[in-house]
Amino acid sequence: MNYFNSLNFRQKLINLRKCKLVEKNFFSKKCDILKRKNIVIVGCGSQGLNQGLNMRDSGLHVSYALRGSSILNKNKSWENATKNNFFVDTYENIIPTADLVINLTPDKQRKEVVTLLQKFMKENSVLGFSHGFHIVEIGQKIRNDITVIMVAPKCPGTEVREEYKKGFGVPSLIAVHMENDPKKIGFEIAKAWAYSLGSHRAGVLHSSFIAEVKSDLMGEQTILCGMLQTSSLVCYDQLVSQGKDPNYAGKLIQLGWESITESVKHGGITLMLNRLSNTAKIRAYILSKKLKVMFSSLFRKHMDDIISGEFSKNMIDDWNSDDKKLKEWRTQIKKTDFEKCKICHKEISEQEYFDQGLLMVAILKAGIELSFEIMVETGIKEESAYYESLHELPLIANTIARKRLYEMNLVISDTAEYGSYLFSQSAIPLLKEFMNELCPGDLGEKISDLQFDNVTLNKINHDIENHPVEIIGKKLRKYMVDMKPIKLS
């Protein structure tokens, strides 16, 4: 039963709106509460491995629980754990010893896994998740004596590790399931877990399982994954149709997202637009307004289906059909020209990505603002909407820079991957049609400087800087004083 849909209207609003920045002084006890505790992570995929590495480096005792068949067959999860010198054992042997069990298995496996875990978990232990989908959308009941918490890093597992190694971290949402906090210790344990990942350096929001799920699904389906995937494919095809060398076009798109979104990470949409000439800024502003109008209905449909539970229902139906749609969409993406083009060795400077990617800048501006606006309209607090529409964006772009869409879809969850493909099915035809409106200088070449009046430029600058996502962004980025620049690919 969908837990969110079982709540009354007031309870839904209270949970959607729950979001408060945890001030740095609240982390004075670091992760001491978890020292000398047995922490067992279930599953050793991208999130499982990289969270475990961070926690161990923070002084915690971490081991892994895998299925007996996984250990016997020495599968990828077993290999991930053992190569990094973690202790691995079966559920029945290791779960009864755990004080904190962190379930990082894929969403589609969690009902079966959580049922099994509850058979072995000792009394008054803690069960952790890094995504609230199972609790909110599946609604499985958890044993009354078990405390249920969440620490949800706002990025793929690979970036959880990379940011930690830089001495920084990634923002996380933490929450305690209101049906399962018998000892009233959930918040302190979640806070310590977040600290061990390095999230205290980047920003920790005290949220709810519901707010995390609904905002996370919206962000990943639209601007974070769906829009980047859609735009990569359509912009690549457009560049090739304009006569650009296919391999150069591939590099411009693949590495362009990373270079452009790095500016967003440090200074929001304002800094991204400031990297353009004044003529290009005005043109990007105009294009982004048109893109917002064009994509508005599609973005709202995704939000509506997420809130109603329709998205989850359809995805679960696909799980029960052996991922028929998911597998078809994966195959389609793998066969695209963008994914198959060769590596280009021609040097492209950082500024050239901006100069030749004016349309890409406009797409990012439109997608960030639209997803943020619709989340806030729905009742999600601005802080949550910011992380899900803007801050996580460069972290996703980093994955595309490594191995294009293959890498992005590999490291994000199956739930994010399904939602991204679903969005692209409708978004690609829209963006292809929009390409007919492009002018020289919008994509693949630098726009010629034109005369403009100061009044127009001043108004555009004011509009960009005073959008609500920019206002909350300035506040939250003050928390991220130790944020490190990425080494561009």
Swiss-Prot record:
It is an enzyme of class 1 (oxidoreductase). NADP(+) binds at C44, G45, S46, Q47, R67, S77, D107, K108, Q109, G157. PROSITE patterns: KARI_C, KARI_N. Mg(2+) 2 binds at D216, E388, E392. Its EC number is 1.1.1.86. Binds 2 magnesium ions per subunit. Its cofactor is Mg(2+). This is Ketol-acid reductoisomerase (NADP(+)).
